[in-house]
């Protein structure tokens, strides 16, 4: 397989969903089918008038809403990509930021920029009709998860503009950019790779707010990269490669270097927990304290985690690891300038990713809200 996306046309989204579901363990697919059946029966029996239990929530100002920002989680990648541009807007043009609403997933939301006086609403048909009549634009990570899917649907119903912010590194199975969108990409190379020349997408290379935040922490982390054996960032949950590949890469690195294995937050399934337990019995250190990457010490390695570039931006040694990488993964490493680690060698660390702009969040804000709200 070459380094090209599997799903780059907007009409490929159903294929992406089918592919994603096919990667789930059989038990998860069975549970999902059962839940869907129960929900369908419940909907028929109760004739629900709401948008459903899984509908995202709306956090809206008292006045007009000209922009919706859709969060799929409250994790650092989503907040850096989607909340930091609003923070930049609130600093530069607070009167415009006052009209920004939010589409929220389940869970307790952190303090969001410009939203101190906002109120939460269920996304019922009445609320959507009455409160979003003046919607002019939405900002999303994509339309493949609930918040972004709802925001894009509402935008299309109202003829509003759709802005897509790249929030992570682009692997071969990345879902497609929505139709007729403006894409705020990390680099022009990423934009070209992701869209494959699509005429309906306007690409604006801006850089990564997450990586810029990592770069700005570098002075406070002097010496962090040389202190101890470091960490290997887990990705056992990933669908892009077989689980055995992620495990083999981790074992190769931690056994050679003494690094700790740092599970991804999504590694909560039975198979992942079993793998962690087996590694512990074999003497591998498992760093499951949940502290942010910036709080760790020493070099950073992974198969293709964004954490490799976060570490590089902060001046820490960082490498990519896979015993026998497929062609698409080697292309991925080249696209981001990731240096491959091999046993018995000391390669040059991965270099920081060059950014097209000095302040990605401010660049996104300036382009998204370049017109009067």
Feature locations, PLM:
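C-terminal amphipathic helix plus adjacent low-complexity
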Residues: 1-23, 334-373
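Active-site and donor-binding regions of nucleotide-sugar-utilizing enzymes
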Residues: 2-9, 14, 45, 49-199, ...
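A nucleotide-sugar donor-handling region in carbohydrate enzymes
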Residues: 20-56, 166-167, 176-241, 265
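Short acidic, S/G/P-rich loop/turn micro-motifs used as interaction or catalytic elements
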Residues: 73-79, 109, 144-147, 236-242, ...
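Conserved catalytic-core segment of nucleotide-activated headgroup transferases in glycan assembly
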Residues: 78-85, 209-278
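Short, charged, surface-exposed secondary-structure boundary motifs
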Residues: 172-177, 193-196, 213-218, 294-295, ...
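Catalytic binding pocket for nucleotide-activated donors in carbohydrate/polymer assembly enzymes
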Residues: 205, 306-359
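Donor nucleotide-activated moiety binding/catalytic core segment of transferases
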Residues: 267-314, 318-319, 324
């Amino acid at each position: 397989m070459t380094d090209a996306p599997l799903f780059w046309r907007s009409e490929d989204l159903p294929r992406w969903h089918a592919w994603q579901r096919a990667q789930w363990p059989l038990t998860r697919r069975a549970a999902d089918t059962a839940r869907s059946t129960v929900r369908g029966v419940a909907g028929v029996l109760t004739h629900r008038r709401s948008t459903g239990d899984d509908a995202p929530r709306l956090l809206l100002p008292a006045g007009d809403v000209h922009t919706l920002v859709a969060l799929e989680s409250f994790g650092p990648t989503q907040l850096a990509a989607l909340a930091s541009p609003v923070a930049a807007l609130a600093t530069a043009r607070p009167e415009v930021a006052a009209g920004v609403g939010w589409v929220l997933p389940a869970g307790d939301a952190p303090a969001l920029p410009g939203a101190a006086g906002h109120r939460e609403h269920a996304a019922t048909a009445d609320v959507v009709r009455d409160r979003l009549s003046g919607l002019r634009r939405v900002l999303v990570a994509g339309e493949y998860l609930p918040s972004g899917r709802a925001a894009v649907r509402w935008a299309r119903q109202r003829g509003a503009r759709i802005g897509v912010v790249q929030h992570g590194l682009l692997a071969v199975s990345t879902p497609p950019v929505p139709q007729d969108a403006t894409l705020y990409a990390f680099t022009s190379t990423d934009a070209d790779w992701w869209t494959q020349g699509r005429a309906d997408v306007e690409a604006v290379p801006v850089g990564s707010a997450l990586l810029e935040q990592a770069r700005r922490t570098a002075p406070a982390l002097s010496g962090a990269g040389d202190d101890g054996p470091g960490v290997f960032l887990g990705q056992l949950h990933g669908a892009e490669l077989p689980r055995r590949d992620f495990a083999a890469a981790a074992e190769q690195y931690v056994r050679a270097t003494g690094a700790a294995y740092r599970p991804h937050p999504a590694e909560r399934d039975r198979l992942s927990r079993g793998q962690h337990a087996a590694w512990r019995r074999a003497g591998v250190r498992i760093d499951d304290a949940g502290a942010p990457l910036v709080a760790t010490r020493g070099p950073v390695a992974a198969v293709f985690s964004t954490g490799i570039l976060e570490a590089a931006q902060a001046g820490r040694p960082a490498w990519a690891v896979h015993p026998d990488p497929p062609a698409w993964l080697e292309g991925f490493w080249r696209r981001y300038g990731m240096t491959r680690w091999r046993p018995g060698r000391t390669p040059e660390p991965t270099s920081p990713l060059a950014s097209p702009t000095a302040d990605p969040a401010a660049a996104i804000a300036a382009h998204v809200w370049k017109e009067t709200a």
